[in-house]
Amino acid sequence: MQLVQLANFVLDNLVQSRIGFIVLFHCWQSDESLKFAQQFMKPIHPILVYHQFVQMRGVLNWSHLELSYMGHTQPTLAIYVDIKCDQTQDLLEEASREQIYNQHYHWLLVGNQSKLEFYDLFGLFNISIDADVSYVKEQIQDNNDSVAYAVHDVYNNGKIIGGQLNVTGSHEMSCDPFVCRRTRHLSSLQKRSKYGNREQLTDVVLRVATVVTQRPLTLSDDELIRFLSQENDTHIDSLARFGFHLTLILRDLLHCKMKFIFSDSWSKSDVVGGSVGAVVDQTADLTATPSLATEGRLKYLSAIIETGFFRSVCIFRTPHNAGLRGDVFLQPFSPLVWYLFGGVLSLIGVLLWITFYMECKRMQKRWRLDYLPSLLSTFLISFGAACIQSSSLIPRSAGGRLIYFALFLISFIMYNYYTSVVVSSLLSSPVKSKIKTMRQLAESSLTVGLEPLPFTKSYLNYSRLPEIHLFIKRKIESQTQNPELWLPAEQGVLRVRDNPGYVYVFETSSGYAYVERYFTAQEICDLNEVLFRPEQLFYTHLHRNSTYKELFRLRFLRILETGVYRKQRSYWVHMKLHCVAQNFVITVGMEYVAPLLLMLICADILVVVILLVELAWKRFFTRHLTFHP
């Protein structure tokens, strides 16, 4: 055996693979092992390789192979196996049972078997598509100092789902005691990446877990597939159909077949049952329907790419009595401004009375007023000017007219600013409810209905948020006997439209379509929206140890880069309601006018009371004069 040349080949292979740790399973004699190790200690490449020798002779049981011989913390560990040894068959079978022909181990299987003999040996082994296995056939050349090593790439698209062993020649190396050279390529593998050469899964049938919530599972598989394949009524099971169409694109890219496993929920608990449970227990290879990446699920699954967005909201129209506000006409100015404005008007009223008094006493008779107005009359003139009212009394003096000019100028400025603020506030947007959080909603008196979705029920059962517990206690437990607590999306949206104050909880990707169908543009702007649960992303999941992880990730990234994903998402998923309030006239409702009418009624009552007091006082005063002449 040409051990020096073999050591040089192994070292060169490790350098090309960027690996610094190797375990060598062999059946050499002690002096041969020493010779091989000495060549490793004085390598032709300036690198340090950690190596460990395992003598296969005398090993009777290869159980717990990975734990006993391959414990490491490196990204990849190289493993050399001498196929000519008698114990090789048992070792390779145990590696197949433990499923360690994967990307974490760089296998070098060295022997002189023909490709057909190697195929018969490895054909029954569980080798994965991400396997890094090389079969190396050595052949001593004529000069006896150089050895040719033909390297073959070995992988399987999936033994348990119909895949066949693939052995493809890669290249040939020629090694002498000093150096190794690549002499020729045996195929075109070097032109593409590892997964570029393995992207065609033509011989396997992938098992895909799919959720269907809007059709009974008693239907045949063909009927369910036909439903998921339809492109109309995008609001019905939109998330499941969105994921299904992405999976069909993946199928076309991989040129494979798929067997769909249908379920009516994502999971019964976090990782048990449903489509998620099928991937966890490895009865499915992939989830077509995106799901949440929770902490519990990530112990068993890997999220390979974002393929969705989850948003549940509570919508309701503002109740008619919720917008009644007594201070709507006082809002343009703060209390301090109102006090100062009233003080200025009072001061001007006093100045006007002084002006009229001086004019009556000091001016010439022809310029005098017929009578001296009272202080109350001048106050009335001042406050009337603030309301853009004229006056029948006009000062004759220049000073008095300057006071009038200042009064009307101040009133004009204040009035225009006041009316602009009031009108803009009344005509800008309708009254919105003050309910902005789930806690406020739970503490309100509003009636609640929910869309009967599996993940909504699961969230109510497993959420640890205190506001959700309060919501369940106040809104759910009190309606356990109410058959209308759980309503389909269409009925729930219609009830929101017809009953202001009714709250409906639904998933936006499907529910928004009904809102856009049954609500006018103005009614959409009137809606209040409260986030039912934190917004979360949906991911396509594989099992944590899936051998298809990297291949599927690359294919999904390709779908994302080409814009196909964005096109599908915009078609299937509705994430936002569009309010175009500037395109229509908003009517001012009673919620704004009622405070004004209330103030007018109160003023009328006050006037009547004052009138009655004045009449009573006059009557009393008249009687008093009659009895005391």
Curated annotation (Swiss-Prot):
Query: GO biological process annotations for this chain's record?
Result: detection of chemical stimulus involved in sensory perception; detection of chemical stimulus involved in sensory perception of smell; sensory perception of sound
Any transmembrane segments, and where?
Answer: 336-356, 375-395, 403-423, 593-613
Q: Which GO terms describe its cellular component?
A: cell body; dendrite; membrane; plasma membrane; sensory dendrite
**Keyword flag Glycoprotein:** yes
Knockout mutant characteristics:
Severely reduced response to acetic and propionic acid.
Give tissue specificity per the record.
Expressed in acetic-acid-sensing neurons in the antennal coeloconic 2 (ac2) and antennal coeloconic 3 (ac3) sensilla class of sensory hairs (at protein level).
- What are this entry's molecular-function GO terms? ligand-gated monoatomic ion channel activity; olfactory receptor activity
Cytoplasmic-side segments: 357-374, 424-592
So which stretches are on the Extracellular side?
1-335, 396-402, 614-629
Name the chain's protein: Ionotropic receptor 75a
Cite the source lineage.
Eukaryota, Metazoa, Ecdysozoa, Arthropoda, Hexapoda
The gene for this chain is Ir75a
